[in-house]
Amino acid sequence: MQTNLLKPKAINVEPLSAAKGAHRAKVTLEPFERGYGHTLGNALRRVLLSSMVGYAPTEVTIAGVLHEYSAIDGVQEDVVHVMLNLKGVVFRLHNRDEVTLVLRKEGEGPVKAGDIQTPHDVEIINPDHVITHLSQGGKLDMQIKVEKGRGYVPGTMRRFGDEPTKSIGRIVLDASFSPVRRVSYTVESARVEQRTDLDKLVMEIETNGAITPEEAIRASAKILVEQLAVFAQLEGQINDIFDAQPAQRSTQFDPILLRPVDELELTVRSANCLKAENIYYIGDLIQRTETELLKTPNLGRKSLNEIKEVLASRGLTLGGRLENWPPQGLDKR
């Protein structure tokens, strides 16, 4: 009886239409054992929404303004609305954790995120985002502190370093650092060979553009692995889980890769062509590319398509790479 749990073989990322500046994608992973779609989908969703690192404005100083309930001469919106609009600006910092930026604008018209003066290692993802509007003769002089953080941090929880008191005119903002806007998931049915009781996990992820959905799901998976690693070895250092016996870990292959290609039930012509190239196991086959197979004598496009279809039915594709293949003791006929 088969006791090994299935691992997802097919991963597909499909970009979806989204609001301007946002990134949205559908990520599909299959197959999972029954129930694992909900188990992993819910865990990934919670991590994506709560634990992604991002950048947000945290403090603002405006010339002539003492507090957030002030009005600014020549500015159509009050300070509260200006702060709300400022939170909609998406920043990305490279090789730094915080920066203070300057925004100076005069004259009638809209003030946009692109008007903020930025150094070379600070990027504004949505430069057309409107922060406020100036009337004729209006002027805005603002300093914006942008920091790196995680999740949501209310302004009441923020401190001012070693300063004994708050500086007059410095406005502290509630900071939403998360670059992930929305996450949803569904679990559909999947099939592998004769098994139809498997799960397919479909996740829709929307970000603000500071990171892509693919980067977000990779980061969330890494967080989960690091958090769960402690349960894999209840004694010793967490790093030992990843560092100990790397050779042993790397030789654990999915059992399907150790099966002979004869079990794929290919046509006699295709099977003979593979054996002529010393391809005896499914693990040998998936490491070949389409180009390499087409160079095989007597193996044409029709045979190649047959091989690809048979592999796809088992959740496999060509062009893979397996470290430490073949495993020790595997019979090369």
UniProtKB/Swiss-Prot annotation:
SUPFAM superfamilies: C-terminal domain of RNA polymerase alpha subunit, Insert subdomain of RNA polymerase alpha subunit, RBP11-like subunits of RNA polymerase. The keyword Membrane does not apply. It comes from the Bacteria. Residues 253-333 are annotated as: Alpha C-terminal domain (alpha-CTD). Residues 1-235 are annotated as: Alpha N-terminal domain (alpha-NTD). Keywords: DNA-directed RNA polymerase, Nucleotidyltransferase, Transcription, Transferase. One of its GO terms (biological process) is DNA-templated transcription. It catalyses: RNA(n) + a ribonucleoside 5'-triphosphate = RNA(n+1) + diphosphate. SMART domains: RPOLD (SM00662). GO terms for molecular function: DNA binding; DNA-directed RNA polymerase activity; protein dimerization activity. CDD domains: RNAP_alpha_NTD. One of its GO terms (cellular component) is DNA-directed RNA polymerase complex. The keyword Cytoplasm does not apply. Its EC number is 2.7.7.6. DNA-dependent RNA polymerase catalyzes the transcription of DNA into RNA using the four ribonucleoside triphosphates as substrates. The N-terminal domain is essential for RNAP assembly and basal transcription, whereas the C-terminal domain is involved in interaction with transcriptional regulators and with upstream promoter elements. Homodimer. The RNAP catalytic core consists of 2 alpha, 1 beta, 1 beta' and 1 omega subunit. When a sigma factor is associated with the core the holoenzyme is formed, which can initiate transcription. HAMAP family: RNApol_bact_RpoA (MF_00059). Belongs to the RNA polymerase alpha chain family. This is DNA-directed RNA polymerase subunit alpha. It comes from Methylibium petroleiphilum (strain ATCC BAA-1232 / LMG 22953 / PM1).
